[in-house]
Amino acid sequence: STSVSAQDSSNVVNASLDTLVVTATRSEEKIKDVPARISIIEPQIVEQSPIAELPHLLMSDASIDMLQYGGYGQTASIYMRGTNDTHTLVLRDGVRLNTGSAGTASLSFIDTTDIKQIEVLKGPASVLYGTDAIGGVVQLVSKTPEKTGAFVTGEIGEHSTYKSVIGADLAENGIYAQIRGQRLESDGTQVTDFKDAQVNAGAYDQKGFSAKFGIEKEQYAASVDYSENQGTSTYVDGINDANWNLIGLKNVSQDFKNEIINVKGRVNLSDNFALHARLSQFKD
């Protein structure tokens, strides 16, 4: 296993006082007005790491301790303020990604293609979010289209890692729509000293798509967001003999699939009062 503790926060951009955050109070506010301590992994950091999976991006924040076994798709745990990994809540646009069975989020299987910024709330937040947030909260904030256009991108990394993304955005008069499709493949990081190519692989194959539609006006707003992410993660399995030598090594594959549905609405009843509603679901 590999244990990484980020000690240098220079990669985490110091947000301006007017930067908007939603994690501290569950509503959009300027960072200068929120009482909680929040750091932000901002868009330029996310965009400079197009192939990076979520655990790699979170290592940019010095308040987070990360433990990951192997490379892409391998088990990763996040620790904040000395608490257990089940005490850090992970959200995407307000939707809980922690599973009911494990109590943690499958960080390695969360696609980061559409992430605008990552907000890290440091310290207890149980009053707002429940016991999952004793250590803190990590909120993934997705992008909202700002202009109409289409794009195709491709990225290449080490260990035969490839990522391609295709997408289109529409934004006009407060109405927006977005569609994305992406594919990530990697031969993975060698996790044993054995030279047998059949057991050294930690291959990862993941594909997904997302779509959103919304309207944003001064007095009201509504949006529908759907994303699906699936693939196969391969890891090495074996047993120890009487001398603690690994024997019977073989590749084991794990299929995964997750999907998020998020429907939100807002109506401003007055200058100081707004009504918010949300219907969301996460399947893993």
Model-found features: residue ranges?
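N-terminal Sec signal peptide and the immediately downstream disordered periplasmic leader
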Residues: 1-49, 55-59, 169-170, 207, ...
